[in-house]
From Swiss-Prot:
Organism: Mus musculus (Mouse)
Subcellular location: Nucleus; Chromosome; Cytoplasm
Name by which UniProt lists this protein: Serine protease FAM111A
GO cellular component terms listed in the entry, alphabetical order: chromatin; cytoplasm; nucleus
PTM comment, free text: Autocatalytically cleaved; autocatalytic cleavage takes place in trans.
Amino acid sequence: MSCKKRKSQISFNPRKNKKIKDYFSQVPKEEQNDPNTVKVDSKKMPRDITNTRDQRPLSPRKTRQDQTPPLNKKITVTLGVNSRKHKNMKYELTCRETSSLYAALNTLSAVREEVESQKGREMLVCGKEGIEGYLNLGMPVCCIPEGSHVVITFCQCKSKTQENKQFFESQDQASTNYVRFCIHAVGSKRKKILKCGELQKEGNKLCVYGFKGETIRDTLRKDGRFCTFIESDDWKLINDLDTIIENTQPVDELEGKLFQVAAELPKNPRVVSVTQNSGSENRNFHKLEEYIVNEYTTLKEEGKKLRAYIKEKSEKRKKKASLFKVHKEHFGKMTRNSTPVKVVKHLSRVSDSVGFLWWNNNGNAGCATCFVFKELYILTCQHVIASIVGEGIDSSEWANIISQCVKVTFDYEELLPTGDKFFMVKPWFEISDKHLDYAVLELKENGQEVPAGLYHRIRPVPHSGLIYIIGHPEGEKKSIDCCTVVPQSSRRKKCQENFQAREEAGFCFSTSFIHMYTQRSFQEMLHNSDVVTYDTSFFGGSSGSPVFDSNGSLVAMHAAGITCTYQAGVSNIIEFGSIMESIDDHMKQDKYKEWYNTISGNVQNVEMLSIDF
């Protein structure tokens, strides 16, 4: 290309001449038209300059001579991979506040090398000091406090990194225009809310940023890490359980707060939808932590034996397609849909004593059901308490932990009530049993009236017929489920029929134990007189629900269930609850006798309330 042609191109674009004038020392007038001088500078046009720190002033974004240079910020970075190479050493990073986190990190050669070696995997950046949660890679550095410490790891993720490159560009907004807040990685109803399975763990948090004036939905949608439900209107944010924030609200007031996403689930009482191509993304049942289930290996072993037996028997059957139809018709004839008004009145009265129990133990959040036993004492499942405190915590610390993170309300019948409707729990945990799976907690007085206790309504469990569970399945509003009692003598047959029927419908034999863990093997459950078995649609969040007979008598506490999965969903096999008479007898033992006599002495001389109308 001739010098004459190059000169004509430069004079045709005065904007670029202005940039040279702005950023370099003044060139003498007689040299401005010298083509040799222009030729040297023309090799460094902005589109050809590599993104080095010394050359950034030539960015096309910087066109104003009087623009204030962006401030710098220091961040400490640790590469949490390849420990032999990096030896957990800390890297000091100084970067411009207008840079995105991703762009800033890539100025470190160690990070660039690791990104290159981790091709096909997604970078995760988690705040360790100064900022918490997994950070959005597009977050402007101005949102990160000075001196923060972050840790970089990598994971396999289905979403492609290049789809989010729009978030890695520099930002020119003032730091005061941003809002930063955190989201629990596990939802309150819809558990799977993130695309990346590595992040989908209890206790993990996502650090999200947005612009003031922007809606919550737009902010989470642009974040890029949430599942497609974020595009709909059927979700909201919950703050500390007592505050609901709709996704159409602006993010302005969310600064520094922690929230949980509550997304609505498809309504199907018996079969839980599971998206075939998304793993377990849409499961709405609560599966127990593996470390809890692993404590009781006999249940898994018996489950394998039973599945093998059922599979062997089912292979011998020729008319497999008709079996499921016959089973459904038979079950339908056994169960009535109508409920006598008298029963409804009984259940309406006792339902006031059923409570919604919620906890948030440093990010480990969940919910269950409880009910008033006597005065300020409430009853729930022992495995619920184990889930609250977490793995490896000494039992001597349980009382203090639950007193700090557990809340109870009895008014969740339509919308979650406000804070003054919640009871806290005293730092007291003395009465419980792992075998019967029950635990007693004591509420703190808060000026609100505690509903009547159900202690005086304990009666023997019926051997057949209908029973009624009242609770908060999946953390939803209080509801009632009518169940058919499975007699003890029919438990094995019922389980085999259900396994066979679901196999014919396309189910696979990989059982999952929901609601709870259990120390009882399958064989022990079949012959255990301390439990009542039944069919119910109540899944996660219903542990601790009271079970009543048709007279409104308290007969059991809902505890456990066995399910099987198949290609399109999850179905229950059988559920069971601990019989209240067995729990009551256990409380009378020497270990708890003093406590039991104290609470029961208040009613010894009081005539039992009639449960008949």
